Amino acid sequence: MLIKLRFLIVSMLAIMLMSCGGYRLYINEEADFGFYQRIGVLPFSNLSGDRNATEKVTSSFLTELLIDSRVEIATMGDMLKSYRNVIKDERSNLPEQLTAEEAQALGKDANIQGILVGVVRDYSQVRSGQAEFPLVSIAVRFIDCQSGKIVWTYEITRKGGPKFPVFSFGETHTLGDMTAKVCRKVAGAFKETLK
């Protein structure tokens, strides 16, 4: 009986750890994060199979960023207007496609010191046995508008946990809930950097 209980506990812990994805964080040590008073967020790019993932993730990220924000955040309308003024060609908003000169021009046009750009890599329900769980993966970069350099990056992948018939803690069943958790984590890490 004791062996079965130990096996059950170890199995549950292993499954819980597997359901948590990791993250990667880069902070440019030379950047003065106290300098940023007004920043902007561009709509995230979408590499996932869900056509609406960019709107859902960008909206959730912006909401989390606005909560207890230490900086002023330009409106999405102002950012899109500036983006159209500066970027004349049709392309997606992949962080890798924004040049240093374009970031500097966006900063001047939108009157911001930094830009957050991101990409949704995965946004889906994945099957595990007979159940489906949410999977969300995003990468967010903060670009300094004076230098055009990337000064902060956060990449994260999270998958919802399996259902336990007896224990129901720490589970995430919907893409909306998982998106909110991922965006809260990224926005929180960014706000901590601004301290």
PLM feature spans:
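Short glycine/proline-enriched turns and hinge-like loops at secondary-structure junctions
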Residues: 52-54, 130-133
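Generic short beta-strand segments
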Residues: 119-124, 157
